[in-house]
Amino acid sequence: NHSLATAKAHWESIKPTLSEAERKTHPARWCLAEVCNLHSPAIQMEAIHRVVFGAPAASLLLAAVEFCDQEGIEITNQRPQYEYHVLTARKQIKVGLRHCKSPLAVGVLEAMLGEYLAGHKEATVDYIHGESEVRRLAAEGNIGILLPEFQKDGLFPGVVQGGVLPKKTFSIGHAEEKRCYFECRRIRP
């Protein structure tokens, strides 16, 4: 979990500044964790969308077509395995893919974006919670990519079939519910 990794990195960064006695009692030594049943209707999982900055849409779409060709992925809107919405300031394009090796839609997208970013150092990607925020950023001249809804029942089969989940696969809860990340850290830096 990225939050756990962030908490550990924070602890590792302050640990050298503490005495042995302070290390044993400092609150940053521990993390806040919640154990819950994923099957509970109270747990809502949402896809985390992508926004690409600093890339011309034509360049990214051409790279996506080349990536799909290399991977044997068919681009089609006829009974697609996965469906994405690509947003620019002027257009919204529905892109369907079939014959994907990844058991999760986000896996295909992450592989393609990773390859693109490696060859285009001027471009960056950010991980965005919420469709409205993706649309707002795309309207400003960036490229928004809306992932399909993340289905809870796809989580464990996705891990079994694909191994480690791709970066920022899903979020539990809505963006505005994530305030605790900041508030808990503020208790004591």
What are these regions (language model features)?
Residues N1-P189:
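Surface-exposed, charge/polar-rich loops and edge strands
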